[in-house]
Every structure is written in structure tokens, then in C-alpha cells.
Amino acid sequence: MHSLSFLANPYVPSHVVYAWFIMALLILCGLLLRRGMEILPGSFQSFMEVVIGGFDSLVTDTMGHEGKKFFPLIATIGLFILVSNLLGLVPGFESPTANLNTNAAMAVVVFILTHYVGIKVHGGKYIKQFMGPVWWLVPLMIPIELISHLVRPLSLSIRLFGNIEGGHIVVAVLFLLAPFLVPVPILFLKVFISLIQTLVFMLLSMMYIAGAMEEAH
């Protein structure tokens, strides 16, 4: 799918331009919502209250009350991924999350925050999480744990990229094969996949951060 001409830039990759576009859109929505807050909410305010309330409940249920401090980051990532995924369904637009670099940027932020939180909460004892339950397994467990942690950002990035980019390819092929019969149910499926992939990225991010705060056994 080709980028819209007004968003095309020969010096900046298209996924970066669309990421900026979505960030500007979310900031604008936030400012409009803040200025237009009412006791009796309108449709837009009600919709956003449901979305943000759902994110808040998800963070609390997954991470407990300690997770409240991470709500701004998790909610921001969730909104960005959701809007990015859905943007690709609009003719002429691209999903930034269909590019591996966009997803890797978010995954690296989660990776760095995870270990920063672990060190901040546990100090030097944080390394115990990499050593396993008994001392004689340390030579085996440390490489395994290091690899498992280093793979996390790669897993987050590739999972989201594969599902979103793969979905776009399937939709494009089906549009060519049966442009009048298949698109509508496939688009509903794409919306569902977009929601699921947003939740998966959020849940895994929260689980990684919550795991870093737990005591090593």
C-alpha cells in the first residue's frame, strides 16, 4: 500500500512519518479531551473514559497497585499500537507497527525499564533472578536466563510485526481475488487481530516489569 502524498518524505522513512502522525493525533485528542471535560460526558469523552478505564483495570489486575506508577507508559504504548494497527485498514495509510523498527523501539524501552526497575527495587540482589533455585545450577541457569531476557524485546517486536504485516498482505491478496465478497469479514477479522495484538504487547510488557519487581526464589 502506498503512502499518502502529503505524508511522504524522501528523507524520513514512511513508518517514522506515520508514527509522528499518530503521536500528533493522540496528543491533539488528549488536549481536546482535557479542554472539553464535562460532568455529563459527551460521546467522545465517554468512549475515552471506557478505553482508559479498561487500561487502568488491566494494569491493576496484572501488576497490582504497584503497577499504577507504570500506567502512563503502558496506556501510551497500548493507544499507540492500537491506533497504528487500525490505521493500516484505512486506504492510503500504513501501520507503523508493520515495520520492525517501530516495534523494536517500544520493546527496547520496556526491556530497559524492566531491568532498571529490578535493580531499583532489589539492588544487587536482582542478580539472584538469573541464578536459579540452587547454587549448583548457577553455571547452567545464568546463560539460560540471560538468553531468555535478551530474546524478550526480539519476541515482542517480531510477534507484532508478523501479525500486522501478515494481515495486510492477506487483506491485499483477498482484495485482488474477490474485491466484492471477502473484504468486509476480513476487515472485521483485522480489527479483532489489531485489538488482540495490542493486548498481547501490553500484557507481556506488564508481566516483564512485574516479574522484575518480584522477589527471587
Swiss-Prot record:
Any one of the GO CC terms: plasma membrane
Q: Where are the transmembrane segments?
A: 12-32, 70-90, 104-124, 130-150, 169-189, 191-211
**DNA-binding keyword on record:** no
Member of which family?
A: Belongs to the ATPase A chain family.
Give the function comment from the record. Key component of the proton channel; it plays a direct role in the translocation of protons across the membrane.
Q: What is this protein called?
A: ATP synthase subunit a
MF (Gene Ontology):
proton-transporting ATP synthase activity, rotational mechanism
**Which NCBIfam families does its entry note?**
ATP_synt_6_or_A
Q: Which cysteines are joined by disulfide bonds?
A: none
* Organism lineage: Bacteria, Pseudomonadati, Thermodesulfobacteriota, Syntrophia, Syntrophales
Describe the subunit structure. Answer: F-type ATPases have 2 components, CF(1) - the catalytic core - and CF(0) - the membrane proton channel. CF(1) has five subunits: alpha(3), beta(3), gamma(1), delta(1), epsilon(1). CF(0) has three main subunits: a(1), b(2) and c(9-12). The alpha and beta chains form an alternating ring which encloses part of the gamma chain. CF(1) is attached to CF(0) by a central stalk formed by the gamma and epsilon chains, while a peripheral stalk is formed by the delta and b chains.
Taking the record's annotation, the residue ranges forming a coiled coil are none
Q: What is the originating organism of this protein? A: Syntrophus aciditrophicus (strain SB)
Which PANTHER family did the record assign?
A: ATP SYNTHASE SUBUNIT A, CHLOROPLASTIC (PTHR42823:SF3)
In its UniProt record, which GO terms are filed under biological process? proton motive force-driven plasma membrane ATP synthesis
Kindly give the membrane topology term recorded for this protein: Multi-pass membrane protein
Q: What subcellular compartments does it reside in?
A: Cell inner membrane
**Keywords, ordered alphabetically:** ATP synthesis, Cell inner membrane, Cell membrane, CF(0), Hydrogen ion transport, Ion transport, Membrane, Transmembrane, Transmembrane helix, Transport
Q: Does the keyword Transmembrane apply?
A: yes
